[in-house]
Amino acid sequence: PTRFETPPPASVDMLWANMALHESADPQALLAEWHQALKVDGFLMFSCLGPDTARELRDIYAQLGWPPAGHELTDMHDWGDMLVQTGFAEPVMDMERITLTYETPARLLHELAELGRNFHPARFPALRGRQWKARLEQALVEHLTGQDGRLSLTFEVIYGHALKAPPKIRISALSAVSVADMRSMLQGQRPHA
C-alpha cells in the first residue's frame, strides 16, 4: 500500500482511510498518528477487513493441513476499543458481509493476490509449485462452487468513525477555573487557553 507522509499535528479536519488499517503491523500506533494529525473535533472514517473475510478459504487450508491462508483480522468491537484507548470519542462501528463470486479459481486467486499478502507467522515459508496450485484450484472448485457454477467467497467489511474530542480538563485536588472560563462553558464556548 502507498504510505503517505504524516501531516503536522492538529492540521487535518477529516481523515478517511479505506482498506488500510488491517494491513498495519501496529494499528494502535497508526490510530495514535491519526489522532495526533486531526484537529479538535476532527472526524475519522475508515473501513477495513474483518475476521470473517475469506473464512471459506481458511476452512479449505485447514482441511488440507496447510498453514493459515491469511493473518488474523481484528473484530469490529476491538477496533472500537482501540479508538477509545487512543483518545477518540463517540466511536461508531458497523460491519457487513459481502459475498463475491468468481468464474474461475484463477480469477479468485488473482483478486486475492491484488488485495494484499499473508502476514500470518505460520504461513508457507517459501514458494509453492504447480502441483500445489492445481490442488488449491481443485479444492476451490469443490468447496466454493454454487448452483450458478460460480465460486463464492465472503468478505467482512468493517466501517468505523469517531471524533477527536477536546482535551479533558485536568482535575486535581485543587483546581482553579476563571470566571471568564465558567461563563464560556455555560455559553457552550471553549475555555480560553
Regions of interest found by a model, annotated:
Residues 28-43:
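A short glycine-rich, Lys/Arg-flanked "PGG" loop and its adjoining helix->strand segment in the class I
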